[in-house]
Amino acid sequence: GPNIKNQECDLLVAVGMRFDDRVTGTPAHFGANAKVIHLEIDPAEIGKIIPADVAVVGDVKRSLPLITERIRKRDHSQWIAGFRACDQIEYEAVIRKAVHPAEGRIRMGEAVAAVARAYRNDAVLVTDVGQQQMNAARYFGFRRTRSVVTSGGLGTMGFGLPAAIGAKLGAPDREVVLFAGDGGLQMTIQELGTIFQSKIPVKIVLLN
């Protein structure tokens, strides 16, 4: 859905983003038909990956209202319906195959979906960095806001376990599930001692 709509759009407003490769894929194909307005506090990010037709350097708290105050209210129900239709097509073509059992092995998408079902998609999701991060983001599914903690563009392995501890301390009434790979987990594995000593009930799913 997002990829299709990205190719259809004629105006792309980028607010405080650096267009990293996990967002753009091949830069030449990203929003190929769109004019780009890039709002960013760091001038070094302007035009670094995606050329900007209009560049606005500064705090978006001040710059974004200059755009939004000029926008007229419109009915986007048809656009949203088209987006949802794309979601359904993607589910049938890609996601269904990834989350259902495969003979002889357990795929990452299948494991993520099984954990999501166990927690009724209501847990706080924390990820380390790697393929499990991508699979968790795609196949976990969410029902509530403020439910994802991930390093995003920082891309720092070892982020997951300390972040999961922090998430549980910040939301003690919610289950916290960490998806990690063996490399990232080992980088901060000493925090298992913190979990044991402080009795912090974080669930860890190791996907190798």
Task: Put a short name on every predicted segment.
Residues G1-I37, R143-R174, T188-Q190:
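Glycine-rich, anion-gripping cofactor-binding loops and their flanking helix/strand elements
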Residues G1-R84:
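Glycine-rich, acidic loop regions that bind phosphate or pyrophosphate groups
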Residues N3-E8, S198-N208:
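Thiamine diphosphate
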Residues V15, L39, S151, F179, ...:
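Generic beta-sheet signal
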Residues M17-D20, G130-Q132, G183:
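Short glycine-rich anion-binding loops that position phosphate/pyrophosphate groups of nucleotides
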Residues D87-A167:
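Active-site diphosphate/adenylate-binding microenvironment
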Residues D173-T194, L207:
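DG-centered beta-turn motif at the end of beta-strands
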